[in-house]
Amino acid sequence: MARLENYPEAIRNHLLKLPCPTFDSTPFNRPIPMKEQRVALVSTAGLHLRGDRPFRLGDADHRLIPRDTPANRLVMSHISTNFDRTGYLQDLNVVFPLERLNDLARNGEIGSVAEYHTSFMGATEPEKMESTVVELASVMKKD
């Protein structure tokens, strides 16, 4: 994990000024055991299938990634120069642990792996993404 002190001063100051939400209470829920859960990955790494339109600055949409997608069919088009791709280039599971998720399902540690996963472009304003997220939530609930 990146440490704040490793960033240049300008970026460090910018990050320290970002607003962070505060919550007065914790929502009540009864978690379902992981062995009964169907799990999907949601990433902000700008991943997509080869042949899909690459992400651009400010894109608020997402790209669906089928469960059986081999690592060599995924491309990262994240636009940030500050986004470290080193781990991704060595092992996709660092950024998008689909193989590990399938291992967990095979070992019975989670119920199953969703048919589709998704990736967004990171650093997009949340307000721009709202309609996309509502649509995606519907797709994920059906799965």
PLM regions and their residue ranges:
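An N-terminal assembly and electron-transfer interface module characteristic of large anaerobic redox
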Residues: 1-143
